[in-house]
């Protein structure tokens, strides 16, 4: 039986990892064993980061809505409850965008929320 040499596969595997480690410093870029560990850790951070990004943006939107609601004399929770009672179903992303780019529109929403809370 012929002897199987695995140089091609090893080269391909090493090249794949070293390409992923492009931009890293020192041995993390040049040495396969170290680069492999660095790439695995980077992929773990990337996976975790994709989950954290969702949390961070939701938190940012809530902060922006809260700031705009307080300018209009409402807390965040009372503003959201007022919108719910008024039957206005806008998500936090859209509300935050309105708060940043359309102050008059947000004030109108706040007035509707106040009206729904008073009723």
From Swiss-Prot:
Gene Ontology cellular component annotations, sorted alphabetically: ribonucleoprotein complex; ribosome
Keyword terms, alphabetized: Ribonucleoprotein, Ribosomal protein, RNA-binding, rRNA-binding
Record has ATP-binding as a keyword: no
Gene3D superfamilies noted in UniProt: 6.10.160.10, Ribosomal protein L20
PROSITE patterns (alphabetical): RIBOSOMAL_L20
Pfam families: Ribosomal_L20 (PF00453)
Coiled coil (UniProt feature): none
A biological process term (GO) from this entry: translation
Superkingdom in the source lineage: Bacteria
A GO MF term: structural constituent of ribosome
HAMAP family membership: Ribosomal_bL20 (MF_00382)
Function, in words: Binds directly to 23S ribosomal RNA and is necessary for the in vitro assembly process of the 50S ribosomal subunit. It is not involved in the protein synthesizing functions of that subunit.
Family: Belongs to the bacterial ribosomal protein bL20 family.
Protein name as it appears in the record: Large ribosomal subunit protein bL20
Gene name tied to this protein: rplT
């Amino acid at each position: 039986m012929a002897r199987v040499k695995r140089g091609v596969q090893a080269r391909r595997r090493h090249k794949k990892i070293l390409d992923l480690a492009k931009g890293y410093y020192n041995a993390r870029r040049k040495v396969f064993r170290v680069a492999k560990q660095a790439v695995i850790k980077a992929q773990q951070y990337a996976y975790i980061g994709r989950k954290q990004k969702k949390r961070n943006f939701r938190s940012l939107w809530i902060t922006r809505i809260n700031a705009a609601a307080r300018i209009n004399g409402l807390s965040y929770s009372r503003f959201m409850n007022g919108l719910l009672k008024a039957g206005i179903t806008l998500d936090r992303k859209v509300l935050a965008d309105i708060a940043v780019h359309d102050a008059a529109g947000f004030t109108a929403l706040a007035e509707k929320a106040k009206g729904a809370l008073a009723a």
